[in-house]
């Protein structure tokens, strides 16, 4: 499988990963990027970040917290390609 990347705009960090069925927050945490998070199920919205480019998927849980356009919830979304985010 081809490696994809997560580019984090506000700290110029690039994370390379092999697409798997794991949440975005898990990938970030494995790379020492810790976000505020409480419920890890999309209810509270504390992990909300901006998706500037790319796509995320909500397979098992769709977030219930209110959000603005381009807001995503890394605790319950997965990715399958490269993305650009702002934390």
UniProtKB/Swiss-Prot annotation:
What cofactor(s) does the depicted protein rely on? [2Fe-2S] cluster
Which Cys-Cys disulphide bridges does the record give? none
Its keywords, alphabetically, are: 2Fe-2S, Electron transport, Iron, Iron-sulfur, Metal-binding, Transport
Q: Which Pfam families match?
A: Fer2
Matching PROSITE patterns = 2FE2S_FER_1 (PS00197), 2FE2S_FER_2 (PS51085)
Q: Which residues form the 2Fe-2S ferredoxin-type domain?
A: 4-87
Superkingdom as given in the UniProt entry? Bacteria
**Which molecular-function annotation in GO is an example for this chain?**
2 iron, 2 sulfur cluster binding
According to the record, how does the cofactor bind?
A: Binds 1 [2Fe-2S] cluster.
What residue range is the signal peptide? none
Q: Which residues bind [2Fe-2S] cluster?
A: 39, 44, 47, 75
Please give the InterPro entries that the UniProt record associates with this protein.
2Fe-2S_ferredoxin-like_sf, 2Fe-2S_ferredoxin-type, 2Fe2S_fd_BS, Beta-grasp_dom_sf
State the protein's name: Uncharacterized ferredoxin-like protein bbp_166
């Amino acid at each position: 499988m081809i490696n994809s990347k997560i580019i984090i705009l506000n700290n110029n960090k690039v994370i390379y990963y092999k697409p798997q069925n794991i949440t975005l927050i898990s990938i970030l945490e494995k790379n020492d990027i810790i976000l505020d998070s409480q419920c890890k199920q999309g209810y509270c919205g504390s992990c909300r970040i901006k998706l500037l480019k790319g796509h995320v998927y909500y397979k098992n849980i769709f977030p219930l917290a209110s959000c603005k356009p381009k807001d995503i919830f890394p605790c319950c979304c997965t990715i399958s390609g490269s993305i650009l985010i702002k934390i």
